[in-house]
Each structure stands twice: as C-alpha cells, then as structure tokens.
Amino acid sequence: MSRRHAAEKKIIPADPIYGSVTLERFINKVMMHGKKSIARKIVYNALERFAKKVGAENVLEAFEEALENAKPLLEVRSRRVGGATYQVPVEVAAGRRDCLAMQWIIKFARAKPGKSMEVGLATELVDCFNKQGATIKKREDTHRMAEANKAFAHYKW
C-alpha cells in the first residue's frame, strides 16, 4: 500500500459548444495521438447525425440518455481465495460506470466496417438511445456474468 497521498482528480473544462464536461471527456476518449480538433469535429458531426436520426431537439439530453442506457450497474472482479479464483460481482463506481460506457461506445463505433468514425459513432449512439446494438449487448453480458456469479457475492472486499 502506498504511503503517499492519493492522486488529485484532474478538472476538465467543459466543451466550448455544449458546455458539458461529460461531452468533453467523451471527446478526449475519441481523440487519438493528441489530435483534439479532429476528435471534436468527429464527435460534433456525429452528434448532429444522431440528433437528426433520433429527432431530438436537445442534443445534449439525448446524448446523456444514450450514455445512461450504456452504463453498467454491476461487473465481476477476480478474487483469489485459498488457491481458487472467483469472479465476484461488485457494483460499478459512478466514475468507472461513465468511463466504461464511453469506452464501449467508441470501441464498437470504431469496429463498424466500411464506415467513417463519424457515421459509426452516430449509429452506435442511436443504438444506445434505442436500447439495442453492440454496446447494450456488452452491458447485458456484463450484468449476466455478475448474475451468474451471485453465489460468490459474499467474497466482496
């Protein structure tokens, strides 16, 4: 266990167009090789496409709802007890919940074949908004794993 103080959380400024810290964190996750202006362009264009497909007046609220639908509530953590490793279901912390949802959305958007990141991201956000698609399947699989290993819940730490 480290004797040093805990690392301070870095405060991220809100994005310039929508004024949302969550959206700025999402842009940072989309960003590759430090190219933030490209990441911003991709995310903003994807949000416009997403808003048109969903028919939402407030883009930010629709984005937040799509993100909320993708957030996992439970996950499994490996715990070694007496030579055996158990998959112990635990609740996901709020920060990690956001982080996982964003990572999954971006991962599956990049995996869409023959489409630009802009189109893939918009499609994945629409799927999350409608509670379907690869991201929601990943969330359900995570919940299913936690449910299947409920017997080991008493090993929580």
UniProtKB/Swiss-Prot annotation:
Gene3D superfamilies documented for this protein: Ribosomal protein S7 domain
Family: Belongs to the universal ribosomal protein uS7 family.
Signal sequence bounds: none
InterPro entries, per database record: Ribosomal_uS7 (IPR000235), Ribosomal_uS7_bac/org-type (IPR005717), Ribosomal_uS7_CS (IPR020606), Ribosomal_uS7_dom (IPR023798), Ribosomal_uS7_dom_sf (IPR036823)
Domain of life according to the entry: Bacteria
One Gene Ontology term of the molecular function aspect: tRNA binding
Keyword Ribonucleoprotein: yes
Pfam families: Ribosomal_S7
GO biological process entries: translation
Keyword flag Disulfide bond: no
Keyword terms of this UniProt record: Ribonucleoprotein, Ribosomal protein, RNA-binding, rRNA-binding, tRNA-binding
Protein name: Small ribosomal subunit protein uS7
Organism annotation: Chlamydia abortus (strain DSM 27085 / S26/3)
